[in-house]
Amino acid sequence: VMDGITALPRIHAAAPFARIVMASTLTHQGAAVTIRALSLGAADYIAKPDAGQIAGAEDYRRDLLVKIRGLGSSAKRTAYALAPRRLGQPLTATTAAPRKDLALGNKTLKAKPEALFIGSSTGGPAALGAVVASLVGKATVPVFITQHMPAMFTAILAEHMAKATGAKVVEAKDGMAAEAGSFYIAPGDFHMTVQRRAGRVFIVLDQSPPENFCRPAVDPLFRSAAAVYGERAFGVVLTGMGHDGREGARVLASKGGLILVQDEASSVVWGMPGAVATAGLACAIKPISEIGPTILNVLRGVNP
C-alpha cells in the first residue's frame, strides 16, 4: 500500500499542476508528516476532525471547501511552483513574464534595513525553505517569520528548516532577544510582534483576537515592525491565500519601509502577495528564485 508521502512525487510527475491538500492529525507525528508533505510539493493541509465530533466535522467540511475553492481559482502555474523538492532546496527561475499592469510602491531605500519580516501561508513552507537557504550565513539582521500554521506545526517547521538549511531557525518564545542572523518563526495560536526595550529588541507573543481569521497573523507583525524599526524594517510577503499582510504593509510603507512580494507565476496562491501588489505597496514583484538574492541586495543597501 502506497502512503501519501510516497505518492506525492509520483502524482506531481504525472500531473505537475495538481494541487494536493494533505489531511493531518494535530499530533507531533502528524505535524512532522505534514511538514514533509508540504516540502515535497503539497499545496496545503487541513486538520482532521476528532472522531465523533459533529462540530469538528462541519468545520472540516467548511475549511476544506475554502481551500479547494482558493486553490482551484488560482491561475494555472508553471510546474516550477509545485515540483517536489527538499525543504531548503534552491529553486530555478520561472519562465512566466512578470505582470506589467501593477503600479509599484516606494522603490528607494531610505536607510539600510536592520530587520527582515516575512509573511506566508499556502505554499509557504517550500517557499520559506528556499528563501532561508539563500540567506543563511549572509543575512546580517534578525529575521521574523509568520507562517499560518497551528500550534506544534510551527515547532516542527522550525526544526525541519534548521536541519535542511543549517540556519539558526527557532520557534519564537515570548521575551526572546532578537539576534542578527537568526530566524524566528511565530508559534501557532500566537501573534508575534517585536518591542524595543532599553535599546534591545525583544519578541512579544500574545493571544489577542485572530486577524484576517488567522493567529498568528502577518498584519500585527508588520505593524510592530513599523513601530520599532520604521524605515529600517524590510517586509516580504510570499505565497498565501487571503489578504493578511496588506494592511500591515500599508503601515510599514507609510513609515518608509520597503515591501517585496513573490510573483503570481511562482506562487501556489497569489492572494497575500497579490493583495499587497494590487494595493500599490510593493517595491518589487519577484519570482521565488529571485526573492533571496533581492533580499540580500536590499540588506546591503541596494535598491530593489
Regions found by a protein language model. Give the residues of each.
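Conserved acid/base catalytic micro-environments in cytosolic active-site loops
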Residues: V1-P304
